Regions:
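Catalytic cores of secreted/periplasmic lytic hydrolases that degrade extracellular macromolecules
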Residues: 1-132
């Protein structure tokens, strides 16, 4: 019995590089939506919170620290090494410390997430309505 092998041509490095250049990075909003799916929570509220807390993704904390949710310690914004890390911290925090505890509306979340701003939930709701 004779074994025959078929040679499969491997792409050259230049061809691989060309393909890689065509792959677009996901936006922060797309990453948040995907991460919400992973954690099993709806994406509408986290997306609205991210838009509010980052000034529609224009804040320094977002641009320089990959902080998509306004997460901070002693009012100092947390910084993350990558956007993926920042998104995971934000959505994971909401999933584990809010949604898992039954806090599933902007009003319920706001009392814990941003207790200093009594208008926070109203603003989140407005952003959700605008994005529909």
């Amino acid at each position: 019995m004779t074994d025959t092998y078929t040679s499969v041509a491997q792409p050259k490095f230049a061809e691989i590089s060309e393909v890689d250049e065509e792959v677009e990075e996901l936006t922060a909003e797309e990453q948040i939506a995907l991460k919400c799916d992973e954690y099993g929570i709806p994406s509408e509220i986290p997306l609205a919170i991210a838009r509010l807390e980052t000034g529609h993704f224009k804040s320094r904390a977002y641009k320089e620290g990959n902080n998509v949710g306004g997460l901070s310690v002693d009012e100092v914004p947390l910084e993350y090494d990558s956007l993926d890390e920042g998104v995971d911290a934000f959505v994971g925090n909401l999933a584990e410390n809010y949604f898992a505890e039954g806090l599933t509306t902007p009003e319920a979340i706001g009392k814990k997430y941003c207790p200093a701003n009594e208008n926070w939930a109203d603003i989140v709701n407005e952003i959700m309505e605008m994005e529909i």
